[in-house]
């Protein structure tokens, strides 16, 4: 196999809590005000990273954000010492404090859109940080995400970092959660599939219940920034019915790897036309497109959302087959589990293995295996240019495990966010983490 896909997972932050901040994300809303366990959440995510690294998959780590975000509270009129600001925010606007304490950066599928060098005109890997302007708590992640990505992929000979698109709803961008790439070998040209929920300038169908967070205009802008060939680019609209059913990002209804697209019957608007366009553009590249479409009569959209069947990772093994990495919730859902057992038993199917991970702490906030990782396709030279301190191995796993066990609380509720001691704990831990991952001073409190 030429080239490879690296997955960079987000470490769960120390303020991981359940506040129901994400309208359209059913798990987030349904678990509002539950007591969280940040330590368990971080260890669950870390265990997945280590397990996949042990199986030979390239696995990296991206850091959490500094939260509660005191600079934002200051910008919004709260004055005094950090302790005074936390007290005032908790007293006068506890919802705002919760939003500015969110650990949602763990879901690095929303960190950026990434295009490999094989698809870009300048033959470099392109990153565009997502503006995430549909949700206040996520829109504040841009600066630190940019700094973390630049510290991880620093060599300008190989990597290009674009600033986020304008902070306006016309260019709403949710990153790689609405982006797939299909192709053959990872270091060969492929077809990039941008998925949007609505078009600002062209109109058309839109969801009625929940917001369409990604616009066509944002996706087109990213394709231009990444210098992609229009003949190898596809823009498709997510089915509004799916969005209204709780599919807030495309990675809740579809996942791709190499030439395979694993998706629901109702993932896209005009789905047969979408699949035909992808197939034709891949054929020009001499590649055979494989669509694994899950019928609604077997798995309903509700079943898909409840189990997060499609919010999975589809990874290529050494033998050429693929493994589907799913959350424990898939095993607990009888119809979904029966389908997966049948799928992996088909000798002619590209997917012949299913791996299950317990990610319950993240799942209760609406984030499965696919949400937790940012895919970065690299060739050998580009891989050698990646910050090695961020790549998962036994030593890093052991260091991060000790770091989490030392710094993270095992219980957190909304009222704890006003505790000034928690803020001190966060700053101490993150300062240490930047040394472990060799990131430099990426946080505002470090400058």
From Swiss-Prot:
Substrate binds at residues 19-28, 110, 137-138, 213, 251, 365. It holds the Pfam family AstB. GO terms for molecular function: N-succinylarginine dihydrolase activity. Its EC number is 3.5.3.23. The keyword Transcription regulation does not apply. The active site is at residues 174, 249, 371. Keywords: Arginine metabolism, Hydrolase. It catalyses: N(2)-succinyl-L-arginine + 2 H2O + 2 H(+) = N(2)-succinyl-L-ornithine + 2 NH4(+) + CO2. This is N-succinylarginine dihydrolase.
């Amino acid at each position: 196999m030429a080239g490879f896909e690296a997955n960079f997972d987000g470490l769960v932050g120390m303020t991981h809590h359940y506040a129901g901040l994400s309208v359209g994300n059913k798990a987030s809303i349904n678990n509002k005000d539950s007591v969280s366990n940040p330590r368990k959440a971080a260890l669950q995510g870390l265990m997945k990273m280590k397990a996949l690294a042990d199986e030979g998959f390239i696995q990296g780590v991206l850091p959490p954000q500094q939260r509660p975000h005191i600079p934002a509270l200051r910008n919004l009129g709260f004055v005094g010492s950090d302790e005074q600001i936390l007290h005032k925010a908790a007293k006068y606007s506890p919802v705002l404090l919760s939003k500015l304490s969110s650990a949602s950066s763990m879901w690095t599928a929303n960190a950026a859109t990434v295009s490999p060098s094989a698809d870009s005109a300048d033959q470099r890997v392109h990153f565009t940080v997502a503006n995430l302007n549909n949700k206040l708590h996520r829109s504040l992640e841009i600066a630190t995400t940019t700094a973390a990505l630049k510290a991880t992929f620093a060599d300008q000979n190989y990597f290009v970092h674009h600033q986020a698109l304008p902070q306006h709803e016309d260019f709403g961008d949710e990153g790689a959660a609405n982006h797939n790439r299909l192709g053959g070998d990872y270091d060969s040209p492929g077809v990039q599939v941008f998925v949007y929920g609505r078009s600002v300038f062209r109109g058309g169908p839109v969801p009625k219940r929940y917001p369409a967070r990604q616009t066509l205009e944002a996706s087109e802008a990213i394709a231009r920034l990444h210098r992609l060939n229009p003949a190898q680019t596809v823009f498709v609209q997510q089915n509004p019915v799916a969005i209204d059913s709780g599919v807030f990002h495309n990675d809740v209804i579809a996942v791709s790897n190499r030439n395979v697209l694993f998706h629901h019957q109702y993932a896209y608007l005009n789905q047969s036309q979408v699949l035909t366009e992808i197939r034709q553009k891949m054929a020009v590249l001499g590649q055979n497109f494989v669509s694994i479409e899950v019928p609604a009569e077997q798995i309903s959209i509700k079943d898909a959302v409840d189990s997060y069947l499609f919010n999975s990772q589809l990874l290529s093994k050494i033998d050429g087959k693929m493994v589907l990495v799913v959350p424990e919730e898939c095993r607990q859902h009888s119809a979904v589990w029966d389908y997966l057992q049948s799928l992996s038993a088909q000798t002619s199917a590209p997917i012949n293995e299913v791996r299950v991970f317990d990610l319950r702490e993240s799942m209760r906030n609406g984030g499965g295996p696919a949400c937790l990782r940012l895919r970065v396709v690299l060739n050998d030279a580009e891989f050698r240019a990646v910050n090695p301190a961020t790549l998962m191995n036994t030593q890093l796993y052991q260091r991060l495990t000790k770091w989490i066990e030392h710094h993270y609380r095992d219980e957190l509720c909304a009222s704890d966010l006003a505790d000034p001691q928690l803020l001190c704990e966060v700053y101490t831990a993150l300062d240490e983490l930047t040394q472990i991952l060799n990131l430099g001073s990426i946080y505002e409190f470090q400058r």
